Amino acid sequence: MVRLTVLAGFLLTSAACSACVIGERQAAASINNAFKAKGKKYFGTCGDQGTLSDSTNSAIVKADFGQLTPENSMKWDATEPNRGQFSFGGADYLVNYATSNGKMIRGHTLVWHSQLPGWVQGITDKNTLTSVLKNHITTVMQRYKGKIYAWDVVNEIFNEDGSLRKSVFYNVLGEDFVRIAFETARSVDPQAKLYINDYNLDNANYAKTKGMADHVRKWISQGIPIDGIGSQTHLGSGGSWTVKDALNTLASSGVSEVAITELDIAGASSTDYVNVVNACLSVSKCVGITVWGVSDKYSWRSNDKPLLFDSNFQPKAAYNAIISAL
């Protein structure tokens, strides 16, 4: 059992003003501290200026989580809406917030078929798309070089049957877009961990999980610098039991690390959340967990109530169960 204490500041403020809730931490112990005490790198969450400007949400992030992923501000439509015209307001906010509060950052995401500007989707020339791809990755990564622990270099490039998705990148460049993206990323920031990230990688026997592991194994053998596989882990209720074996399958591909990158679970049962945490703990290459939001209030799946804090920012039973399990 990890021994944890409540922040003294919370106790002092609560004693001084029992009616003051906004801005105070809502959980008795930091899930990040407990997880790191077990040898992992971080237990994090996602956010952007909107949610991080909410004082209650921000207080929980500062007190309980150790890593941040930008929810939308680093995606292509946000950073390069027009060719060669970059916009970093939202991403800068996230990076400045994280660095000033001592949070690790996972950059998300450099190459994705969704939230992709029309001008990129309309490219049909191989040389043009190669140039655009390299320039985008280089410009974004250079801006934050040395501040990002890991980058999701490519995101959601697989179909459910384990084949490669027919995105503009694949249609124009073929499978080689993966090599171009990772080699460019490595040249820009050699210290950053470079990830391939996807969803529905939660069952070792699922075609997509097998396809991911097989392709990554092949790409690594070809010298493509892939450091990690990110499993988003958006789960339905009861979907946690297969996560451990799936992580082991992904880890067997030859990557140096794996991570749970966008965790949320319909219903947020204590059993499901503890199962996922234990899965990461049991897989030596699993370096951390990121939940996809703090409170159900801001969740993209709000109707499923999938997060660790309810819409009033109170910790759920699952949060406390994780602390107890650790």
UniProtKB/Swiss-Prot annotation:
Pathway: Glycan degradation; xylan degradation. It comes from the Eukaryota. It catalyses: Endohydrolysis of (1->4)-beta-D-xylosidic linkages in xylans. It is found in: Secreted. One of its GO terms (biological process) is xylan catabolic process. Its main location: secreted. Disulfide bonds join C280-C286. One of its GO terms (molecular function) is endo-1,4-beta-xylanase activity. Keywords: Carbohydrate metabolism, Disulfide bond, Glycosidase, Hydrolase, Polysaccharide degradation, Secreted, Signal, Xylan degradation. The active site is at E156 (proton donor), E262 (nucleophile). Pfam families: Glyco_hydro_10. Induction: Expressed in presence of xylan and repressed by glucose. Residues 1-19 form the signal peptide. One of its GO terms (cellular component) is extracellular region. Residues 46-325 form the GH10 domain. The keyword Hydrolase applies. Its EC number is 3.2.1.8. Belongs to the glycosyl hydrolase 10 (cellulase F) family. Endo-1,4-beta-xylanase involved in the hydrolysis of xylan, a major structural heterogeneous polysaccharide found in plant biomass representing the second most abundant polysaccharide in the biosphere, after cellulose. This is Probable endo-1,4-beta-xylanase C. It comes from Aspergillus terreus (strain NIH 2624 / FGSC A1156).
